[in-house]
């Protein structure tokens, strides 16, 4: 039994389908443990046809926030209370934050991460045209 999990441990998660291959639980749980954060991260296989029920379950369980992968990104953007400017522009969200009142805000970090990675590898986008395709 995991000794660091208690009745006070905050749960965070990934939803989408399939998620069994995701490295996110290992990455987040390692980070939580190293930083002494009383939290756990799990991946839940939530097919598109069950995404609404999945988001309702997340609300009911008081999950602290969650990530979204395909095929649920667009559907989740219609189930949150608010969208960040990037999520509105893209029409999908990959990260959902939950405030102290349970309000869900959808964000999309795909575009920012893509551009940051290009910049870190010496690719300057000024005056260039590119298209980000998300499957």
What is the predicted function of each stretch?
Residues 4-126:
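Phosphate/diphosphate ligand-binding glycine-rich loop within oxidoreductases
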Residues 127-135:
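Glycine-rich phosphate/diphosphate-binding loop of Rossmann-like nucleotide-binding domains
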